[in-house]
Amino acid sequence: IPTFVFDEIDQGIGGEVGGQVGQALADVATEHQVLVITHLPQIAVRADRHLVVSKGVEGGVATSSVETILGEDRVTEIARMLGDPDGAAARRHAEEMLGRAVH
């Protein structure tokens, strides 16, 4: 299966255009493997699998970790991407976005 990697494909776009890009990527993913690095929830909600990459420093050494998220953790992450992981309105919006996303 051909693989496409898009690193920060959301650079310079937002909202509605991000949703259109997310749909286009979902369409490509029906026949190809697609890996997307994004900061836009409009793109992230289209993913079949959602991974969160976290960076930090431990003992003076830069570290990275990758975690697959599902269910409520995914709602929380989309709400975080919307700007308010603990806010009820952002969580409702995240749930709506995930519910509307077509995979």
Locate the predicted segments by residue.
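GG-anchored amphipathic helix commonly corresponding to the ABC/SMC/Rad50 NBD signature/C-loop
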Residues: I1-F4, V28
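C-terminal lobe/lid and adjacent interdomain/linker elements of RecA-like ASCE P-loop ATPase modules
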Residues: E16-H103
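Walker B catalytic acidic pair
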Residues: D7-E8
